[in-house]
Amino acid sequence: MSQEKQVFSIDLAGRQLTVETGQLAKQANGAVLVRYGDTAVLSTATASKEAKNVDFFPLTVNYEERLYAVGKIPGGFIKREGRPSEKAILASRLIDRPIRPLFADGFRNEVQVVSIVMSVDQDCSSEMAAMLGSSLALSISDIPFEGPIAGATVGRINGEFVINPTVEQQEQSDIHLVVAGTKDAINMVEAGADQVPEETMLEAIMFGHDEIKRLIAFQEEIVQAVGKEKSEVKLYEVDADLNQSVREMAEKDMHSAIQVHEKHAREDAINEVKKRVIEHYEAQEADADTLGQVNEILYKIVKEEVRRLITVEKIRPDGRKGDEIRPLASEVGILSRTHGSGLFTRGQTQALSICTLGALGDVQILDGLGVEESKRFMHHYNFPSFSVGETRPMRGPGRREIGHGALGERALEPVIPSEKDFPYTVRLVSEVLESNGSTSQASICGSTLAMMDAGVPLKAPVAGIAMGLVKSGEHYTILTDIQGMEDHLGDMDFKVAGTAHGVTALQMDIKIDGLSREILEEALQQAKVGRMHILDHMLSVIAEPRTELSAYAPKIITMTINPDKIRDVIGPSGKQINKIIEETGVKIDIEQDGTVFISSINQEMNDKAKKIIEDIVREVQVGEIYEGKVKRVEKFGAFVELFSGKDGLVHISELALERVGKVEDVVKIGDVITVKVIEIDKQGRVNLSRKVLLKEEQEKEAAKEENKQEQQ
C-alpha cells in the first residue's frame, strides 16, 4: 500500500466528488478527505489494539462541525465551538446507524470514527460526504469492517426523483429522504415527507439504493488501490462446555418465563432464572470472566426463544397477534395553565405532550453550518429514568432523546400552518412517563392531541406507529406496535408517522442483510392499517382543533405598514419601539416587508400598541380633518397634535373668521380644536386651518337659513 497522496473522483448528481488519501491524518488506522463541490470533510477511523472488557461493541461516531467551514466566528465569550449542535448530533446518529451492523458479533475493540467538516457548500451535503468518508476510512483501514456502505439523499420535484437535491430543489421537494446501505441491501432510512403515499416512499428508497450501489463500486476501487490488509482480531466467544451446561440448567425455565405476558412480571421471572444460574456458578467460585460468559449465554437463550416463538409459533411475548395494537387511551386538556396538553397511552407506553404558543420573536435562533437561521416549530423529547422504573442521574438530553425529538418534529412539521395563517411560534415538549417500546411514536400522537387542544389549526392530525420484523431463514413475521423486548431482540425497527393521506416521517434501522422489497412493502401497508386505527382513536377524543386559544396563550394582531416607515416605529437605537413595549407590555416583531406582529395575553394592550403604531406611520393628507390638542402657542400661531408623533401649525391668520390680535384670545395649551390640513410644504411641515372649517360651517348655516325662508 502506498503512502503517497492519491486522488479518486466520481460524478455525483452533476457535481464532482473527490476522495484524497495518503496525505492527511496518517497516524489514524484509516483517513480520507472527501471533497464534494466546495464541501470538504476529513474522515478518520481508529481502533484500539486490544479488546475491551465490555459486553457490547464500543463504537463511537462523531460528526464535528467547525464554524470556519462557513466563514463564521463562534458567538459568546469563549469564541470556540462548544457542545455539538443538534444538527451535528443527528448527523452522528445518521452515520452510526448504517455502520454499526457491519462489524462481526463478538468484536469488542473500541472503534472511533470522526468526521470534521472543514468547508461547506450548501448545495453539496456535508452529511453525505461524511457518511461516505466514514465508510471509506474504515474500509481502507486494517479494522475488520464488513462494508463499505454509502448514503444518498432523495428528493421529489414535480413527480420526479432527484439525488442529492440542491438547497433550491429541497424547497420545492415533497420528500426529504436519506437512505443508506450496502450494495446488496438497505439498512437505514430517515425521511420526512409532505403526506406522501407509501408506494411513492418505497419507490424513493429503491431509487436511492441504485445510487448507493454506484458509490459502493467507487469505494471498492479505492480499497483495491490503497486499502490495508485487515488485522486478525480475536472475537469474543463463550466456552462451548459452559454454553451447554448453562443451557441444560436454564432453557426450560427461561422458555416459561418469556411467555409471561405482563412486562414487569416477565422481567421478574427472567431475572429469577438468571439469579438462580448465577448463584450456582458463584457457589463454585467462578471468576468474573466466567460469570460474564454465563450472562452472555442467558441473554442468547432469551433472544433465541423470543425469536422462535414469534417466527415459528407466531406468539408474541405479551400474547398479541402480529398486527394487534396494544390498548389505547387518550386525554386532552389535563393541565389547566398550559396552552394545550395531550396524554397518549398505548399499553405500558405513555407520553404526556405539552404545547406552548409564543410570539414570532420566540423562534429558535440557529447558529450552525446550514442556511436556516431560525425555526418557529420545535419538538423536544424527554425520557426520565422513572419511565422504566430505574434510577439514574438527571442530566441534559442525550443523543437518543435529541434523535427522538427530531423524528417527532419531522413528522409534525408538514401539518403545521404557515406563519401567514398562524403567526405563532409553537413549542412541543413530550414527557415520556412510561416506556415499553415505541415512545417516539407515542410522543407524536400526544403532540398532535396537545396542538389540537391548544387550537393550532393543523392541516391534518398525525399518528405514528413502530413496526418490527423477526426473520429466521425463510420464516419471517412483521410486528405492529413493537414493545421494548421485540425492538431489542428483533431484526428491524421501522417507525412510520403520517396522516390519513400519507407519510410525513419514516425511520428504519435494519440489523440483517437481504431484506426484500416485498417485505418492506408489506411492512409499510401493515403500518398504514395500524396508523389509521390510532388516528380513529385520537379523533374520538378530540375531533378537530379547538376554535379558540387558551386564555393563557398570547393573542396576536397582525398589521402591515409601509417598509419605509419601519425605522420610524423602531426609532433611534430602538427608543420608539421600546417605549411602546414599556407602555403596553406587548411583544412586537417586525418583518422586512412591513408586516408587524403584536402579541400579549391582554387584547386591550394589543389594540393600544396597534393604535400607537398606526399613529406613528400614519400619513397626513391635504383636505383631511382632525380633532387635535393644542401643544404649544407662539406669537405667529398654535401647534396642534393631530395624532401621536405628528403636529401641525395653525397660523394666527387661520384661527378665526375675524382678525386675531393675540393667539391666546382664541386658544390656549390643552384646548382640543378641529382643524383641516390645507398644505404640506416641501419640508414636510403641515399647515392647518380652523378658519376654513368655521367658514364652511357658516356657509352651511346660511344655506340652511336660505332654504328655510324659501319654503316659507
Curated annotation (Swiss-Prot):
The top EC class is transferase
- What are this entry's molecular-function GO terms? 3'-5'-RNA exonuclease activity; magnesium ion binding; polyribonucleotide nucleotidyltransferase activity; RNA binding
Keyword set for this entry? Answer: Cytoplasm, Magnesium, Metal-binding, Nucleotidyltransferase, RNA-binding, Transferase
Q: Which gene encodes it?
A: pnp
Q: Where in the cell is it found?
A: Cytoplasm
Q: Tell me the protein family, please.
A: Belongs to the polyribonucleotide nucleotidyltransferase family.
Q: What's a GO cellular component annotated to this UniProt protein?
A: cytosol
- Write down what this protein is called: Polyribonucleotide nucleotidyltransferase
Q: Which SMART domains match?
A: KH, S1
Q: What is the lineage of its organism?
A: Bacteria, Bacillati, Bacillota, Bacilli, Bacillales
